[in-house]
């Protein structure tokens, strides 16, 4: 059963409401990260709590908000535009793929808002809150990235690598009232939603296979949900006292749909492959399995399948016909493995 309470659900839906697209551009200035202050406006990439942690994806120099245009610039004059919808484009070169379409993103947003994956959001939020509560506290002055020598500063940064619409990131931030968040993705339609997923979340267009546009040791918690893992970069940006939370499917995930729809099965070696991708950089700290029974309509089944790798490996026409033949509603198992990885 989901542990997302009705109050938390209302809070998540409320913070997902859009903000005005035109927001004042802040000029980056030194910020005292040891003394929390009230949030006076929704966070975006120009906010001091975020921009202090960002780095130029070209030269790795610090970034600051430009005063003449809506952009971030580094001392070497590399410039990165802020979209009207609130995210910053920190992509260099062509994206490896364009990600989900606007229609796919809209369907995914509706699916998540219906609570079908609350089992994942809740597990991430509870694990992140527990982890930060027990991690080392502040010690010493903060670095330029906002972190202290043995702690995370007053505004711990939560990064979601492959964030999609930012739904899971928003759930984690709702459980961490002093944290700020950054959603990274290559899909612009998803980032338009991620940029307004939570008042304390910013969003950036970035390829997580490349160097991440973040300072060393800048991140307290790094989320990775059904997304590729860049072990080298994850280790570089994660604070030594931080945690990487990785969510992967178990072999029971969507098992009721695999044969009837001809979906890809979860690789039996999935756990080993995840460990290999992080080997030498992280050590597994704990693993928990989270399961929920979903009751879905046919359209929701189509959305769910479209959120996974089978969407790229199954004939669309045959898949649509198989979904139409399903009895409605459909009962499906969601089963995921959440592993906490510690930096070595």
Regions flagged by a language model, labelled:
Residues 210-221:
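A short acidic, Gly/Pro-enriched loop at the edge of an enzyme's catalytic core
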Residues 243-275:
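Conserved class I S-adenosyl-L-methionine
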Residues 97-123, 127, 131:
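Class I SAM-dependent methyltransferase Rossmann-like catalytic core
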Residues 8-46, 129-157:
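Intrinsically disordered, low-complexity terminal tails and inter-domain linkers enriched
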Residues 4-5, 9-12, 18, 35-98:
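N-terminal auxiliary segments of SAM/dcSAM-dependent transferases
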């Amino acid at each position: 059963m989901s542990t997302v309470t009705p109050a938390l659900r209302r809070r998540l839906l409320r913070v997902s409401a859009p903000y005005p697209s035109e927001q004042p551009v802040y000029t980056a200035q030194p910020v005292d990260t040891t003394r929390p202050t009230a949030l006076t406006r929704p966070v975006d990439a120009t906010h001091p709590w975020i921009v202090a942690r960002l780095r130029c994806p070209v030269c790795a120099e610090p970034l600051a908000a430009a005063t003449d245009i809506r952009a971030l610039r580094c001392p070497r004059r590399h410039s990165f535009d802020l979209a009207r919808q609130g995210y910053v484009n920190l992509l260099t070169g062509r994206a490896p793929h364009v990600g989900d379409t606007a229609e796919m993103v809209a369907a995914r947003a509706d699916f998540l808002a219906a609570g079908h994956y609350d089992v994942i959001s809740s597990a991430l939020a509870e694990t992140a809150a527990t982890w930060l509560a027990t991690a080392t506290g502040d010690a010493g002055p903060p670095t330029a990235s906002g972190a202290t020598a043995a702690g995370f500063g007053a505004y711990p940064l939560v990064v979601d690598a492959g964030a999609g619409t930012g739904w899971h990131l928003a759930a984690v931030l709702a459980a961490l009232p002093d944290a700020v968040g950054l959603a990274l993705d290559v899909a612009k339609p998803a980032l338009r939603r991620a940029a307004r997923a939570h008042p304390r979340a910013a969003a950036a267009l970035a390829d997580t296979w490349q160097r991440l546009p973040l300072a060393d040791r800048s991140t307290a918690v790094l989320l990775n949900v059904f997304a590729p893992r860049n072990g080298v970069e994850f280790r570089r940006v994660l604070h030594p006292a931080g945690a990487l939370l990785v969510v992967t499917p178990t072999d029971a995930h969507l098992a009721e749909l695999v044969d009837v729809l001809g979906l890809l099965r979860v690789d039996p070696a999935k756990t080993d492959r995840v460990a290999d991708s992080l080997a030498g950089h992280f050590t597994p700290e704990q693993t928990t399995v989270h399961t929920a029974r979903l009751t879905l309509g046919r359209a929701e089944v189509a959305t769910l399948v479209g959120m996974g790798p089978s969407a790229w490996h199954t004939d669309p026409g045959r898949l649509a016909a198989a979904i139409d033949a399903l009895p409605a509603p459909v009962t499906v198992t969601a089963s995921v493995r959440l592993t906490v990885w510690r930096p070595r």
